[in-house]
């Protein structure tokens, strides 16, 4: 069967399979004006323009009411926050379709820093692994979540990102398994559009698994354990256009003295070009040694017009941590599970966003660092705040917000945001938008939520085993599924039940 024929049959199967688009039951006639007004008057139910549900009260503490595990592709209302939740991956061992194989035990998004939706929100990529899984990743319809197709056989998609520009909605940017080729690949038409031979093998794809390309899809940084290089994938201005291959000089990591007695102890945890393409964030790994500040240390490099790389000097008085306090040669305040964004409240400066990781610091759990000079801004109030787990700034079409997955471990019980997915505003005001509880044990890595927003920030995809806060209908701690919280307006929904604020009076 030809690729085009197979793709057509996949489309035909999608149209006939389950025979419907998802709808949400209309219940307007059952809601009285008094009920609607009561919902509007509740402090926690204050709305955000353009959003359905979500809670803006940053001080409220909520328990997790029981919510049975949603059936596949059947939306339910989040009982506390009023958003909609849909499980978008099927039951383990069930048939996806006659041509697409079976669902595995581990079907979810990749990670909080990797965007699962394409630039237009019309396609969505999920992993499908373990158990009876047939193929991974799977491409779903980005709106209905119906499976569309499996990977093209010619696509060496070892490590990939969707192209962030709406001009390339079908294109993924990928590094081959061998780490020797960077490519643009049209996953809808199974066609390689652009290719670059890398000057050295990348040790693990784009940014050691956690990097992204610049917001316009032009720049990428590729690395191994000791080197990095910038690729201009879409040359403009005075540079010749593609297929001219514009690759910068290879930069070798300088001694960094992360470990006393070993100046070359500089393990590469992950690396990424900044949204503007002007900076590189190199996050160092612990290398298995005892952690203090070095476990979450970041060093910022600058990229010049010739794509040459050098450490970027920070302001001498910018806040740093521990023995790095007096080292402004690229070092910044340590952050865990950090992502980068352009800050609309600061002239679109590149900023690093993540969890506070300086021992003894009294800042809020969520912190912003400006890459130009290392300026530190706390974005949340630390009082009774749950621990930070992961964060995502993949909402590139809704700038000004950072989506945080808060921990639900025993140390966070009874705290604000415990077990929640929360958007935090970048202006330092402490403004939040609370989307929902993720109802997972988070007992293993793949059971962690790793919430990631859609490009427009109105939907959030998270992973869960749905084995806590589930009442009598729970999932299994060994089965991991993908769930979408949908906060878009324009669809009828049932308002959430009245919930109790458990904050300490």
Where are these regions (language model features)?
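Acidic, serine/threonine- and glycine-rich low-complexity intrinsically disordered segments
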Residues: 237-382
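Blade/loop signatures of beta-propeller domains
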Residues: 53-95
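Blade-terminus and WD-like Trp-Asp/Gly-His loop motifs, strongest in beta-propeller folds
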Residues: 107-109, 114-123, 154-176, 205-219, ...
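Blade-level signature of beta-propeller repeat domains, shared across WD40, Kelch, NHL, RCC1
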Residues: 446-493
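Asp-box/WD-like beta-propeller blade repeats and closely related beta-sheet repeat scaffolds
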Residues: 151-228, 235, 241-260
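Short glycine-/Asp-/Thr-/Trp-enriched loop segments that recur within the blades
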Residues: 94-110, 201-207, 253-266, 324-326, ...
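Loop/turn-rich, solvent-exposed surfaces of beta-rich toroidal or solenoidal domains
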Residues: 348-440
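Structural motif
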Residues: 132-139, 179-185, 226-232, 288-302, ...
